[in-house]
């Protein structure tokens, strides 16, 4: 037997936590969440599902902050943090007072914006926010192309998330998504 000091146990614990975090995510992404009035498990589950699905090999850092946003009249925000060129660090702010369905859809909506930033379709050009090289400031909020895409995809992603988490088959998914091809008929 080899004697183990308290410092060895602490360092092993931190190392184990780090390794567990990396393998649990399946990707090299790092997600933190804070605030009040939300389900930590649901927040992690949806975020990890999205990042594993769309960015399994990217190193993305996401901080999800839950706070009261009613005064601002929004359910959520997604902002890049740090460098504008190839952003990989993001802050997502979510309202704390949402039911489960609205919470998941809002988080997915903001994660779609994260994807837009990562793939480069949403970026700053000459100090203006642009989507596919077109400034979005000339549109009202509801008609901005990046918001239209996020609203369309949040519904589809919500159903995909529920189907994958509930173990539905391809046939059951095809009932809701008729444009999906079935592998085996």
Where are the predicted features?
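Aromatic (phenylalanine/tyrosine) cluster motif
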Residues: 15-18, 23
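Active-site recognition of the HExxH zinc-binding catalytic motif
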Residues: 105-117
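Active-site scaffold of zinc-dependent metalloenzymes
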Residues: 72-101
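Extreme N-terminal basic, low-complexity initiation segments
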Residues: 1-11
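Post-HEXXH active-site segment of zinc metalloproteases
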Residues: 101, 117-148
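Long, well-structured alpha-helical subdomains associated
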Residues: 140-143, 154-185
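Short alpha-helical functional segments enriched in proximate histidine and acidic residues
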Residues: 114, 118, 153, 157
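Zn2+-dependent metallopeptidase catalytic core
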Residues: 38-58
């Amino acid at each position: 037997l080899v004697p183990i000091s308290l410092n060895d146990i602490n360092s092993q614990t931190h190392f184990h936590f780090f390794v567990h975090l990396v393998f649990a995510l399946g990707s090299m992404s790092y997600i933190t969440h804070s605030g009040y009035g939300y389900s930590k498990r649901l927040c992690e589950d949806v975020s990890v599902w999205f990042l594993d699905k769309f960015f399994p090999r990217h190193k993305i850092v996401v901080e999800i902050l839950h706070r009261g946003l009613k005064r601002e009249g929004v359910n959520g925000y997604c902002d890049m943090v740090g460098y504008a060129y190839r952003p990989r660090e993001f802050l997502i702010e979510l309202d704390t007072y949402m039911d489960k369905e609205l919470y998941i859809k809002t988080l997915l909506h903001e994660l779609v914006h994260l994807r837009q930033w990562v793939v480069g379709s949403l970026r700053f050009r000459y100090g203006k926010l642009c989507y596919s090289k077109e400034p979005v400031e000339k549109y009202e909020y509801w008609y901005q192309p990046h918001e239209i895409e996020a609203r369309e995809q949040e519904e589809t992603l919500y159903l995909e998330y529920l189907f994958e988490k509930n173990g539905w088959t391809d046939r059951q998914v095809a009932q809701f998504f008729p444009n999906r091809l079935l592998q085996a008929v």
